[in-house]
């Protein structure tokens, strides 16, 4: 009898351990992810949910960052030679495998395709917390500006964004968490969220850091998603955030989390000259 009890206890412990491991895995999977990651380890990403189609001339700074010629993430034109995206979009990828397509409303056709010559990932990027989620891309060829290709404005170092500021996020990511990437560029208007409120919302996932900015509606419904990662969050013509991570997509009570651009303005200038 004692042997049977011991066996049952061992089985129970194994079942509990397995359940805890699965729960922990689910928590890891809420982090944002590219639509096609060169190093897929967890879900880390964002897509446009509850938004509307736009022409690229409405967001001429928008680029599609492509891994082996397939849409992977978004990005923003900073100058004729530099693009800003998320570090989790470039981690583990060689520059030779990356290109950007820009000047088109479709990520798979039109516009111009330019090779990436160099990736400058932020030295403090933390893949577990998605902190310092920034990468600069130096392009092989200089861009020619037009109505459909323009650099985005940048904030000053440590410039703040007031709570409730209306912002616009754009990209080709999913319109549903399990859907395919959008063929046509989309955007959504979302207000910024108080930092303490956002930190509380994500407390079970470790909270948010000072490098992070949150935007979205309490009731959900509008957000970025897988495939939008690395893309722009713009307010008054300035790039205030980079699509980074979140719990699901457009989930009530969980705003989208973006990498705050103002805190690395000097780093951008030092490494790109922009």
UniProtKB/Swiss-Prot annotation:
Disulfide bonds join 73-89, 198-214, 225-249. It comes from the Eukaryota. It is found in: Secreted. GO terms for molecular function: serine-type endopeptidase activity. Gene3D superfamilies: Trypsin-like serine proteases. The keyword Signal applies. SMART domains: Tryp_SPc. Residues 19-47 form a propeptide. InterPro entries: Peptidase_S1, Peptidase_S1_PA, Peptidase_S1_PA_chymotrypsin, Peptidase_S1A, Trypsin_dom, TRYPSIN_HIS, TRYPSIN_SER. One of its GO terms (cellular component) is extracellular region. The keyword Disulfide bond applies. The active site is at residues 88, 133, 229. Keywords: Digestion, Disulfide bond, Hydrolase, Protease, Secreted, Serine protease, Signal, Zymogen. Major function may be to aid in digestion of the blood meal. This is Trypsin-1. It comes from Anopheles gambiae. The lineage of its organism: Eukaryota, Metazoa, Ecdysozoa, Arthropoda, Hexapoda. The gene is TRYP1.
């Amino acid at each position: 009898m004692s042997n049977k009890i011991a066996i049952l206890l061992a089985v129970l412990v194994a079942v509990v351990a397995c359940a805890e491991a699965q729960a922990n895995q689910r928590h890891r999977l809420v982090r944002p992810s590219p639509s096609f990651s060169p190093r897929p380890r967890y879900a880390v990403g964002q897509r446009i949910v509850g938004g509307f189609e736009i022409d690229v001339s409405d967001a001429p700074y928008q680029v599609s960052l492509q891994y082996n010629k397939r849409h992977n993430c978004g990005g923003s034109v900073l100058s004729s030679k530099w693009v800003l995206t998320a570090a989790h979009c470039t981690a583990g990828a060689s520059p030779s495998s990356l290109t950007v397509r820009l000047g088109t409303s479709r990520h798979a056709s039109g516009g111009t395709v330019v090779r990436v010559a160099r990736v400058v990932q932020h030295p403090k990027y933390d893949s577990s917390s998605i902190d310092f989620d920034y990468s600069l891309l130096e392009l092989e060829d200089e861009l020619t500006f037009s109505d459909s290709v323009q650099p985005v404005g940048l904030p000053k170092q440590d410039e703040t964004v007031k709570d409730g500021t209306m912002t616009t996020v754009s990209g080709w990511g999913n319109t549903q968490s399990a859907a395919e990437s959008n063929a046509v560029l989309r955007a959504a208007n979302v207000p910024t969220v108080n930092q303490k409120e956002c930190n509380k919302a994500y407390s079970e996932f470790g909270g948010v850091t000072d490098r992070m900015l949150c935007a979205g509606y309490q009731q959900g419904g509008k957000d970025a998603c897988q495939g939008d990662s690395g893309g722009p969050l713009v307010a008054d013509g300035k790039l205030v955030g980079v699509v980074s991570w979140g719990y699901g997509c457009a989930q009530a009570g969980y705003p989208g989390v973006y990498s705050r651009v103002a805190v690395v303005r000097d780093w951008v200038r030092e490494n790109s000259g922009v």
